[in-house]
Regions:
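Feature captures the catalytic cores and cofactor-binding loops of soluble hydro-lyases/lyases
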Residues: 1-111, 125-157, 162-164
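C-terminal binding/interaction regions
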Residues: 115
Length: 164
């Protein structure tokens, strides 16, 4: 095991390096943390991640676990992880670097890449595809809205014969 200088490898220090190194508006930024094989270990919790609120991040994404779901649910940012941990993870993992490529669930993620997350999960969108993906997403949203309007107006028997 390597000995790391504790004052250099702190969550707070590397959190701010990651956020300050992002060219995007913090409100459009997701902090991505790789567990590097420790996916059952807590990488952070409500106290450490309160920094995300302080700087206005949109969310946090990790393949590891997070703690304090009740606290995180009250925060204005979204959090995606592999599950909730009870125990503090600092005895197992320590932050090491910021603004480097990481691998989450077999997917390479590079600083500045587009990530879309919702309650179903997260998707990394290649830079070369962003315009097409956004255009398609807007069309899907419009189609869904039109379908909801149609469903809201349908009669009782109509709903039995229509696909949606």
């Amino acid at each position: 095991h390597a000995i790391l200088a504790p004052e250099e490898y702190t969550f707070g220090r590397l959190f701010h390096q990651a956020v300050d190194g992002s060219p995007a508006n913090p409100g459009n930024t997701v902090l991505v943390m790789a567990s590097n094989g420790h996916s059952s270990t807590s990488l952070a919790g409500g106290t450490k991640l309160s920094r995300a609120t302080n700087v206005g991040l949109a969310g946090v994404l990790t393949d590891g676990r997070l703690r304090d779901f009740d606290e995180l649910a009250a925060e204005p940012f979204a959090a995606w992880c592999s599950g909730e941990a009870v125990a503090w993870g600092g005895a197992v993992v320590t932050p090491f670097q910021a603004n480097i490529p990481v691998v989450i669930e077999g997917v390479g993620i590079y600083p500045g890449q587009y990530i879309f997350c919702d309650s179903s999960g997260a998707v990394v969108i290649p830079d070369s595809d962003i315009d097409e993906v956004l255009e398609t997403a807007h069309q899907v949203r419009a189609d869904d809205s039109a379908s909801r309007d149609l469903i809201a107006r349908e009669g009782r028997n109509e709903g039995l014969t229509r696909e949606r």
